[in-house]
A protein has these predicted regions:
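Glycine/proline-enriched, intrinsically flexible loops and inter-domain linkers
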Residues: 1-270
Length: 270
């Protein structure tokens, strides 16, 4: 049996993985209870994150079907962070905790199998809006390096699968101007194989509006593996001042919001 633990502020998630014959058992016993915040995760999302890891480590032509996942069993205590019950808030469980579940299951299996270093570990949920418009996007970052090669840069990692909105589309449809949209060079962790770089997304608002950001990896860096260095932590700034990882605040005409998304962890010592 192999196991791992991750801290999802202010809670922890534990994962023990047992491979017995043709069965894989993933057990989240010891995970913190659900709480009043919105990082709680429904069991269906927890299972999806575990299935994602299994898909990554098996043949690429394996079909996504009930039969393919029949040998995989996922258990979690009722009412814990990764098996929340009503009336728990779960919005960030779907976007943020799911990413951390992927991290801990990969880390547990890393005791037995070659696995990638941690990727950016967040979806960097970004939203602007007022009575006239709403803009919402998840923003990519760096993928962790694999034992065979560098991690890709500026991509959606793990449970995220959305496309990046082109700068031209944003400026045509919204009262926003794109100041920077580029790779965050050097943010991937160093190593025999480098982690992918995150991105910089900088937007100036042309109307008064509200900003909401829901993100992780602003305090703790995506860890490297096998002597590889950690990826850079993410940052959220408004007019140059660093903000907390989760916030809602008023913006005024001319304010500038800048996302610097995390890089992926490196793999192996240089």
């Amino acid at each position: 049996m192999c196991s791992a633990c991750a801290i999802i502020r202010p809670r922890s998630s534990n994962s023990a993985v047992e491979i017995a014959g043709d069965e894989i058992r993933i057990d989240f016993t010891g995970t913190a209870p659900q709480y009043d915040g919105n990082l709680n995760c429904p069991l269906a999302v927890t299972k999806s994150a575990c299935y994602f890891v299994v898909r990554c480590l098996t043949e690429p032509d394996l079909p996504a079907s009930g039969g393919a996942f029949a040998p995989v069993t996922v258990t979690a205590p009722d009412g814990c962070l990764v098996n929340a019950r009503r009336p728990a808030a779960v919005v960030a469980g779907n976007t943020e905790t799911s990413s951390r579940i992927v991290d801990v299951v990969f880390a547990a299996l890393g005791e037995l199998l070659p696995v990638p270093a941690a990727g950016q570990g967040t979806m960097n949920n970004l939203a602007f809006g007022n009575d006239r418009f709403t803009y919402y996007e998840t923003v990519g970052g760096g993928q962790g390096a694999c034992p065979e090669g560098d991690g890709p840069s500026g991509v959606h990692v793990a449970m995220s699968n959305t496309l990046a909105t082109p700068a031209e589309a944003i400026e045509l449809e919204y009262p926003l101007r794109v100041g920077r949209w580029e790779l965050r060079l050097g943010s991937g962790g160093a190593g025999a194989h480098r982690g992918g770089d995150g991105v910089v997304r900088e937007l100036r608002v042309l109307e008064d509006c509200r900003l909401s950001v829901l993100a992780e990896r602003r305090r703790h860096m995506p860890p490297g593996r096998g002597g590889g260095e950690d990826g850079a932590r993410g940052r959220t700034l408004v007019n140059g001042e660093e903000q907390p990882p989760k916030l809602t605040r008023q913006l005024h005409v001319g304010d500038v919001v800048r996302l610097e998304t995390p890089g992926g962890g490196g793999q192996g010592a240089e």
